[in-house]
């Protein structure tokens, strides 16, 4: 290898400098992962070359035996991870090794807390890849040449992991990439042959590309008066190099599944659960699907790529094949290996492919089955899953109508039957506890747990001992607009329309309600006249027992939470008028009926309306007027 004069110095992207500094402190306790990351990158480079060579065999350059080699130089204290994969051009080296081309980067750094344990998990999720080399090296040299380019088009990248790196043109005979680690004095353990073999066996046994180390030969020697011929030195494969998903699941240990997950997902934590499935028949495919233990920091970033590693007949095709997993399952990682897709498949071909549609359905069903089994067998573990991914799963009924019932069974909610805000109640739990005569599943959506739990709309349900599901996440209103029934029972918002308790109300209660409506007809009309266009309707309530008033959305109107959701998304929202319901048994409403002064009557009516708005919406358009009105009425009391 010879170096040319075309050398340049570049500054690292700010985020790279931050990441390098963080790794030195947060990942040092698990420093051997650098080798896993670098071998994983080398394996990916081999996979990409194998795929590109399907359409251009000349890229192999008469060397189709893809491999990764570890080369130790004890004298110079260097460890080299060398591959003969796809390689990189000068521009690619600058792009990939000098910047983090990843959406959500700023959000990632914002989430770092300074807590070493938590930060190491976040960094692991982010995928440090190449930069992990600086955990053990004080200088890193990368020499690369892209497959299909001339030897003179090689490039050398070098950095000490500080603020800058240099790039120079070099001549490199073989294609691929050499990552040369100049190890720190205290890291000489990674120059030991057996230490390296142990790390490879631990982390890289499952990758499909052979990892090789040089085995020294032995000289001729005399033994029992005879000459024993020595053996020449040779490259020896030190990993199994069999794609994990192609093996019999019964022969694979949990530790192997866990390490393969870390290779696929570039995560430092073990997965929460996984499923390995081989299907033969009309379609032939193998899937190995993982659910992570922790949500990635960019889970809600729609620009971030998600999806499975796609292989066709064990040949790598692409990363992040999102066509095989719906967006509500975008947290799922893993591998899909199909025998039915063409080797020259592209993302465009996948979009409208019948095989793709069938595989997507099968993979979705598989994940939902895995989650259902987890929920049944290990409630504590499922609760952990729900806390990490529950809000994403709630997107499911809107996206996946065919699996709506299965998704609904996986949903968890807080309810009035519990004390805290832990979301542990399933719809099946709720149905199993329904009171005799109850025909509907009742729920409420609000801005917070406290707002939901203390809503005046719940008063009649508490009085009758009827459980209500409590929802306060932003996605809940969207969920409930697409999940209208479960197990043949309608899901009903307690803040919408006329309250129909069905058989939960006896004839005496219904008659009392009718009499209250007749007795207060004059007051209702007077209140409606006073409020005018501010409300859609005024009526006597039978959902309140302690509060004087509440506002209700009519059956066809847009709920408060849906309005907030649309406004947050920048969508235009039509003007919404609510129904005001009055509790005729409350002292304030009774007082209204005795006020003859129309101006004073109007003040009290407006106050009751504003109180109801505040309880339902969490705010008012004109809070200053509300405060002034309270002060005036207090002075008159």
From Swiss-Prot:
Belongs to the heat shock protein 90 family. Gene3D superfamilies: 3.30.230.80, 3.40.50.11260, Heat shock protein 90, C-terminal domain, Histidine kinase-like ATPase, C-terminal domain. InterPro entries: HATPase_C_sf, Heat_shock_protein_90_CS, HSP90_C, Hsp90_fam, Hsp90_N, Ribosomal_Su5_D2-typ_SF. HAMAP family: HSP90. SMART domains: HATPase_c. Disulfide bonds: none annotated. Residues 565-637 are annotated as: C. It is found in: Cytoplasm. The keyword ATP-binding applies. Keywords: ATP-binding, Chaperone, Cytoplasm, Nucleotide-binding, Stress response. Residues 1-347 are annotated as: A. Molecular chaperone. Has ATPase activity. PANTHER family: HEAT SHOCK PROTEIN 90 FAMILY MEMBER. This is Chaperone protein HtpG. Transmembrane segments: none annotated. The keyword Cell membrane does not apply. NCBIfam families: PRK05218.1. Homodimer. Its main location: cytoplasm. Residues 348-564 are annotated as: B. It holds the Pfam family HATPase_c_3. One of its GO terms (molecular function) is ATP hydrolysis activity. GO terms for cellular component: cytoplasm. The gene is htpG.
């Amino acid at each position: 290898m010879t170096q040319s004069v075309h050398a340049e110095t570049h500054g690292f992207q700010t985020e790279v400098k931050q990441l390098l500094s963080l790794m030195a402190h947060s990942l040092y306790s698990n420093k051997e992962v650098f080798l896993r990351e670098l071998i994983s990158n080398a394996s990916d480079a081999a996979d990409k070359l194998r795929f590109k060579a399907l359409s251009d065999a000349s890229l192999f350059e008469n060397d189709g035996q893809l491999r990764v080699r570890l080369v130790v130089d004890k004298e110079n204290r260097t460890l080299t991870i060398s591959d003969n994969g796809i390689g990189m051009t000068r521009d690619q080296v600058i792009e990939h090794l000098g910047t983090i081309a990843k959406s959500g980067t700023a959000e990632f750094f914002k989430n770092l807390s300074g807590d070493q344990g938590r930060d190491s998990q976040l960094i692991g999720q982010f995928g440090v890849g190449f930069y992990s080399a600086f955990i053990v090296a004080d200088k890193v040299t990368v020499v690369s040449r892209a497959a299909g380019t001339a030897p003179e088009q090689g490039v050398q990248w070098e950095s000490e992991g500080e603020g800058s790196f240099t790039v120079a043109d070099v001549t490199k005979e073989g294609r691929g990439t050499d990552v040369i680690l100049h190890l720190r004095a205290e890291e000489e353990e990674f120059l030991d042959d057996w230490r390296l073999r142990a790390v490879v066996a631990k982390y890289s046994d499952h990758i499909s590309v052979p990892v090789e180390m040089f085995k020294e030969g032995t000289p001729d020697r005399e033994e029992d008066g005879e000459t024993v011929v020595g053996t020449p030195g040779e490259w020896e494969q030190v990993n199994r190099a069999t794609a994990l998903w192609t093996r019999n699941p019964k022969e694979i240990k949990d530790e192997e599944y866990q390490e393969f997950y870390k290779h696929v997902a570039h995560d430092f934590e073990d997965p929460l659960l996984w499923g390995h499935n081989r299907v033969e028949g009309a379609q032939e495919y193998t899937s190995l699907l993982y659910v992570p233990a922790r949500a990635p920091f960019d889970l809600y970033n729609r620009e971030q790529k998600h999806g499975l590693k796609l292989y066709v007949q064990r040949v790598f095709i692409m990363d992040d094949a999102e066509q095989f997993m719906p967006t509500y399952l975008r947290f799922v990682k893993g591998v899909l290996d199909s025998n039915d897709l063409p080797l020259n498949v592209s993302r465009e071909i996948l979009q409208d492919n019948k095989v793709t549609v069938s595989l997507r359905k099968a993979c979705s069903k598989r994940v939902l089955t895995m989650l259902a089994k987890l929920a049944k067998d290990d409630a504590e573990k499922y609760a952990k899953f729900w806390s990490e991914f529950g809000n994403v799963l709630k997107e499911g009924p809107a996206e996946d109508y065919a699996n709506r019932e299965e998704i609904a069974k996986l949903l968890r909610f807080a309810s009035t039957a519990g004390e805290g805000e832990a979301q542990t109640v399933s719809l099946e739990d709720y149905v199993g506890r329904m009171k005799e005569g109850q025909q509907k599943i009742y729920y409420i959506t609000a801005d917070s747990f406290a707002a939901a739990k203390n809503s005046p709309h719940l008063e009649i349900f508490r009085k009758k001992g009827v459980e209500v599901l409590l929802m306060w996440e932003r996605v809940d209103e969207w969920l409930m607009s697409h999940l209208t029934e479960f197990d043949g029972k309608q899901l009903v918002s307690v803040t919408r329309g006329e309250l129909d308790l069905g058989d939960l109300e006896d004839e005496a209660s219904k008659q009392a309600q009718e009499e209250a409506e007749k007795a207060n007809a004059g007051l209702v009309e007077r209140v409606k006249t006073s409020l005018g266009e501010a409300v859609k309707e005024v009526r006597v309530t039978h959902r309140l027992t302690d509060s004087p008033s509440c506002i209700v959305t009519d059956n066809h109107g847009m709920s408060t939470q849906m309005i907030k959701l649309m406004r947050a998304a920048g969508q235009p929202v039509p003007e919404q008028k609510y129904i005001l319901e009055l509790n005729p048994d409350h002292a304030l409403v009774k007082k209204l009926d005795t006020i003859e002064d129309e101006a004073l009557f109007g003040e009290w009516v407006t106050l009751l309306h504003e109180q109801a708005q505040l309880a339902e919406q969490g705010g008012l358009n004109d809070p200053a007027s509300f405060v002034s009105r309270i002060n005036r009425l207090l002075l008159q009391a």
